[in-house]
A protein has these predicted regions:
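Amphipathic repeat-derived elements
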Residues: 2-7, 53-57, 67, 72-77, ...
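Terminal targeting segments of Actinobacterial cell-envelope proteins
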Residues: 1-17
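Short, surface-exposed interaction patches in beta-rich subdomains
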Residues: 183-195, 200-393
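Short linear S-[DN]-x-LW-Φ motif typified by the pepsin-like aspartic protease active-site region
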Residues: 35-114, 122-140, 147-159, 164-169, ...
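Hydrophobic membrane-insertion alpha-helices, especially the h-region
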Residues: 16-36
Length: 393
């Protein structure tokens, strides 16, 4: 069966059909298990001009499509959803000195539709695609420089060679690899995001979120669990209902409203608040601020100061290399161990008595709470020269 066109006529060339179009092309199904291939040429009357865009060409695919593979070189890719057949709009730009417009191919085999312009990998041209597919279609998109937008599809795998990526309403797992452009994701079933330098923003992820960013900032919110690796940019995480892990090479880290949280900072400051579970922080030099931690507190400041307030932690272990430590508890902890490495230490705890041991290295020591050597709750503080104060909350 020949393909059908409403506005245009087929011309045979080298055993394949080239469609000279002025409007819309409708491709009919060839057979239940067959495949089709379409090659288009310019529809500009009088021929193209150097570096000019061929008027947008639209194709309607009547055959069922379950998966889409789009490849673009230097031009945008946009995939959205709507009921009905697949619609493809192509925007072609090229240099007429190179011999004519690039070949654009569409091939389909067993429900997989592939859109590509292979000639543009080495030629001075670009082809952009704007595709409308039914919801649930899985998408693979690869762009060498142009922006990529995918909205409302099934699972998606996006590879961007530098342009920004935007994905929203993805009904299956989402994978994004971006070599420099920013990445923005709103609502996906799960996401694995890798950015070569651009910023990353992800919100409303219903499954696990994994982010690797070489240098751009990372902002995530409303996800059940997140693992973030930042090569230097700041990290902001909020409304994480489950575990949160952050490794930051130098940028600051802010976490608010999370489950069990582990933060490793290569130098930037750390702020953690409303942590519903244990909090573990290793900071190479930046200061640490924490509040509203309900689980065990474990902090190694590496030199920067630590201030932790509104704690209901059952235990706390703090190690510092010179920075001061301030801990404020709302409920009586079972065990507290602090070593400031030289900085001052200030603790406020409710109730008592506590079994208190302290070594200030000769500096001032003030203990204003009830103490007993055999008490069930214990506080041990070593300041190595810093002053110590323990008082009631």
């Amino acid at each position: 069966m020949q393909p059908i066109t409403a506005q245009g006529r087929p011309q045979a060339t080298r055993g394949r059909w080239i469609w000279v179009l002025s409007g819309t092309l409708t491709i009919a199904a060839i057979g239940a298990f067959g495949s089709w291939a379409i090659v288009r040429a310019s529809n500009s009357p009088g021929g193209p001009t150097p570096f000019s865009a061929v008027p947008t060409r639209t194709v309607i695919v009547t055959r069922p499509v379950t998966a889409l593979n789009v490849q673009s070189y230097g031009a945008p890719i946009k995939v959205t959803t709507a009921p009905g057949p697949v619609r493809i709009a192509e925007s072609v730009t090229y240099d007429s000195a190179d011999g004519g417009p690039p070949t654009v191919t569409d091939t389909d085999s067993r429900g997989l539709l592939t859109l590509a312009a292979p000639a543009c990998t080495n030629a001075n041209c670009s082809v952009g695609f704007s595709v409308t597919v039914p919801s649930g279609v899985t998408v693979t998109a690869s762009a060498s420089g142009g922006p990529v937008t995918v909205v409302g599809t099934g699972a998606a795998d996006i590879d961007s060679g530098g342009g920004p990526v935007y994905a929203a309403g993805i009904g299956g797992p989402l994978t994004v690899t971006a070599d420099g452009g920013g990445v923005t994701v709103n609502n996906a079933a799960g996401a694995d995001l890798d950015s070569g330098g651009g910023p990353v923003t992800a919100t409303g992820i219903s499954g696990k979120l994994t982010v690797h960013a070489e240098g751009g900032g990372v902002t995530v919110s409303r996800v059940p669990t997140a693992a973030i690796d930042s090569g230097g940019g700041p990290v902001y995480a909020a409304a994480i209902s489950g575990p949160l892990t952050v490794n930051a090479e130098g940028g600051g880290v802010t976490a608010t409203g999370a489950g069990a949280t582990q933060i490793n900072s290569g130098g930037g400051p750390v702020s953690a608040s409303t942590i519903q579970g244990p909090l573990s922080v290793a900071a190479e030099g930046g200061g640490v601020e924490a509040s509203g931690v309900t689980g065990a507190l474990n902090v190694d400041t590496g030199g920067g100061p630590l201030s932790a307030t509104s704690l209901t932690s059952p235990s706390a272990v703090v190690r510092g290399e010179g920075g001061g430590v301030s801990l404020g508890f709302l409920t009586a902890p079972a065990s507290v161990r602090v070593d400031t490495g030289g900085g001052d230490a200030s603790l406020s705890v409710p109730g008592g008595p506590y079994a208190v041991t302290a070594d200030t290295g000769g500096s001032q020591e003030s203990v204003l709470i009830a103490t007993s050597p055999g008490a069930a709750s214990s506080i041990s503080v070593t300041t190595e020269g810093g002053n110590l104060q323990i008082g009631p909350a």
